[in-house]
């Protein structure tokens, strides 16, 4: 019955994964499917499914992070006090695998930018035979250290985080190979000076394989590792003049044949099959198909599963058999829906989750070979609110847009408009979903028309569309919102363009503030949540990917900074930000507030005490949306 206690490292890892729940947030099935591995308050437990017997693992002091089953299911591994450990389940005894890890130089944990920007959440990997662990060593020496304290409890010591700002020192990462039985590690060799980012590691159905990137992220290498010597062989080089997008699902090895690889060199996302030496064998998913996510591959039937489609607001589940044409997998999902899927270990079944603008997420087990679908029962409550949303594409192959009108909409009446924005890389706002539109429908019901659109720089279009924002976050992202808003109003004359407000969070917080600062003739007020204000204060891997290294591209940082536009600002902005945000630090809001205050510009700061980049507290979330509605009623 005691409250859960998490260390700063555990909290940060959950934050990177965008996990707001607490308690048993995940579980892992053993390789034979008979046991569950769960973590709670830094301790590990194994649950026998048949008997429901629970065993607490005999781990030493400190929190156990990133637990995993060994390939044979006889051991459990984890990171504790900066090193990798295993517990032998036969006698419930702990053994240290790596040695010498410290806070500054830990073993087995992914560094901040790997977790936040590369979607790589682990820092160690088992060999298929369970004899060796490949582990990351991260040297934070010389990096900047940011501190976050709880302003409500100044007596509590501040948490400290290594944080790499653009143009400054990054963590130095290397990969070691350690036999579980002991001995000295073997260090993997590659040109880390030219390729400092260890982006992807995989060790399944093929050799230990790495993807490493140069700092500019315009070039990456696929490397095969000899585990006996640590020497590497280059299998493939991927280059892009703007940047190379990472996908953690590739390289995906097909044992004895080669590996699948994702590229955009032909104008849009494409999936290739390459041989063991990296030579191109065939294109399995062509650019015109609209590849979204790779689900998995079943070598027995030579079947690749993926989601995608030509409409970026939706996707469907497809399969390609032995390099043939893609065809739809029969699922319960309607045509205009958003689908995610997981392939079973034996490749025979898929767990398919789908949602639409009228349906909350539902899950079914699908066995394509038998054309069998079995719904998974749900105990989720059905919302009482139904979004009244219209989704369409603007003319001339323009942005996709969505409009939500009030429930009591009166034809002929003019309504103030709220432009809900994100507009940045790797995220779409206009989607065929219900849950994410519930709060926006509530906002519309307060007497607004809510509009959103996905302009240039957003994903699931062409390479040129996404990379149009290179070296400039401000011009096209804001310009597309303004021009798109005007185009939508031509379809919906009830929109009162003399009363437009902008709301967004994170990059959307940046864009909403930018619209009020730079386009005050159109956007009359903004509600800006957790905005990046000066991109020189965000992290290296994200920012340098799009804007370049500051010394080489100072103009990109100047034109993209909100501070540049403060002197000419004419519209009010409300800034809301968690004081414990370890992604977009609270300093961003303080910087903008300081500049606006000294320039005599109207603004309000609403700090969320000791909250991070997410707002998981239901009461705070409720008050947040009430404040959004109140703010726009006051200012529009």
Predicted regions, residues:
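Beta-propeller folds
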Residues: 1-340, 346-349
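Serine-hydrolase catalytic core recognition
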Residues: 121, 144-145, 200, 211, ...
